[in-house]
């Protein structure tokens, strides 16, 4: 699986030099590139540019909506190893938003996106295993709460590692918007995994593991966001009350 540092530096962000006379850089999102710059980077096969241009075609952001073109660009970015492109190749088929809903195809592609390192696909896969086929009108996977726990933990690990890199680098607002989604998934993944440990759901009941997971995540939250996460605090309080 991809390492978080490569994920961040090769696929999520690019380096902007605000001052040509200074070696200092700011990390920027590909979404900040104008169309000319994005097309130029795409011509050189830059995965982040390919993925971003795919999203612009998919959602009609400054371009005419073209789902086929979007899929072509996502595939090129995925071939270069971009985890988010793998996620998009699956997610296009999750709903009818783009006129391509095909849940069987979505669930066929989702594990590959998760295995390639997509933090979002990892958690979506956890949810799919937790809900089972009944949660998706007969589509998807057999109920498997143990697998759900495994993928929630992997999503929490990847999203936390990416957040650590983000907090350590000078980043622009556009990149902060992306990492807002990473943060939300981190909280949901930690909460879900801790709850399963607390309830013995898909695993042996293990309040110590739940407490360890939540305490570590809460300390991370305090260090970087200077506040407690209310979701983590609620579960830690429940653990304390139950002894």
Language-model features and meaning:
Residues 162-182:
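Acidic, Ser/Thr- and Gly/Pro-rich intrinsically disordered linkers and low-complexity segments
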Residues 10-14, 50-59, 88-95, 124-136, ...:
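Hydrophobic face of amphipathic alpha-helices that form TPR/SEL1-like repeat modules
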Residues 144-161, 208-223:
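TPR/TPR-like (Sel1-like) alpha-helical repeat modules
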Residues 49, 85, 121, 182, ...:
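The tetratricopeptide repeat
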Residues 18, 43-46, 59-61, 80-83, ...:
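Short helix-capping/linker turns of helical repeat alpha-solenoids
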Residues 24-33, 66-67, 100-103, 142-145, ...:
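Helix-turn-helix repeat elements of alpha-solenoid scaffolds
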């Amino acid at each position: 699986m991809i390492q978080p540092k490569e994920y961040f530096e090769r696929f999520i962000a690019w380096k902007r030099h605000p001052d040509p006379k200074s070696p200092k850089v700011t990390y920027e999102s590909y979404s900040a590139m104008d169309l000319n710059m994005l097309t130029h980077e795409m011509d050189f096969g830059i995965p982040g540019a390919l993925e971003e241009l795919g999203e612009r075609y998919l959602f009609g952001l400054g371009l005419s909506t073209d789902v086929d073109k979007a899929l072509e660009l996502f595939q090129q970015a995925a071939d270069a190893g971009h985890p988010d492109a793998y996620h998009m190749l699956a997610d296009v088929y999750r709903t009818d938003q783009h006129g391509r809903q095909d849940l069987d195809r979505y669930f066929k592609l989702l594990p590959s996106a998760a295995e390639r390192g997509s933090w979002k696909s990892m958690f979506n896969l956890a949810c799919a295993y937790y809900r089972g086929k009944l949660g998706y009108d007969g589509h998807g996977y057999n109920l498997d709460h143990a697998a759900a726990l495994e993928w929630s933990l992997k999503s929490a690990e990847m999203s936390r590692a990416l957040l650590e890199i983000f907090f350590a680098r000078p980043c622009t607002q556009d990149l902060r918007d992306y990492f807002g989604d990473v943060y939300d998934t981190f909280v949901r993944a930690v909460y879900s995994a801790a709850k399963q440990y607390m309830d013995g759901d898909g695993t042996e009941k293990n309040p110590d593991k739940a407490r360890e997971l939540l305490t570590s995540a809460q300390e991370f939250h305090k260090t970087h966001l200077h506040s407690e996460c209310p979701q983590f605090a609620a579960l830690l309080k429940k653990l304390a009350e139950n002894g």
